[in-house]
Amino acid sequence: VREAYGAIATKLAAFGINMDLAPVADIVSEQGNSSLQGRTFGSDGATAAPLVNAAVQSLQEREVSAVLLTFPGEGAVTDGKVSKSLEEMKNSDFLTFQSAIQNGADCIMVSNVSAPEITGDDTPCSLSGTMITDVLRGTLGYNGIVMTDMLGDSAITARYSDGDAAVAAIVAGADILLCPADFSKAYQGVLDAVSAGTITEERIQESLYRIYRVKYKNTLNNVQ
């Protein structure tokens, strides 16, 4: 794993690319989410965790930020929903994420699936303050960059306008909004929300701090 991800990071860095949307930290059984088959490190969180860590460390040692996919875990998703409770997730899907957090993962992508047993409603996790701020940042103690899954995905666009989705993601605690269906509308929605006081400038600064902290770390490593 270290050798493979080291080779990937070296190639990316040679082209000036400083972030990789990998590794996939989900765990999935043979009967689980078919879209993840062959992309994960297995069906057991305790076994997969050191492999995820090896991938993260190998990327980041070469100044390429790892982005762990896809919190809270899509391995057992049915009809766009995770049916496990918080305690069940802590003992299974969260093991890889928790371990990588403790080992300094730069960024975590939050999924567009919902987790009603954890959040109490069907809000997509990428737009849920309960999932991002309370669980990921609070329970798991993560203070790195949070990236949403693609906001142009039908799970989002079927229920939210581009502007509303962008605002909801930032209010929930996300730092990077990935691929809204219409960037201009998403951007204007954020500007309008700041003007209205729905999003404070301090909230934007929090995200900028997390992003620049990683950029500065990588730049400093390159200088050294």
Walk through the language-model features, giving the residues of each.
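Active-site-adjacent structural elements in enzyme catalytic domains
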Residues: 1-16, 20
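Short alpha-helical functional segments enriched in proximate histidine and acidic residues
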Residues: 11, 15, 58, 214
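Short coil-to-beta-strand
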Residues: 16-27, 104-105
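Short, conserved phosphate-binding/catalytic loop or strand-edge motifs used
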Residues: 27-35
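Aspartate-rich (DDxxD/NDxxD/DxxxD) Mg2+/diphosphate-binding motifs
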Residues: 38
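Second-shell residues forming the walls of enzyme active-site clefts
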Residues: 43-203, 210-213
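Flexible, glycine/charged-enriched surface loops at secondary-structure junctions
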Residues: 199-205, 220-223
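Structural signature of the thiamine diphosphate
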Residues: 211-223
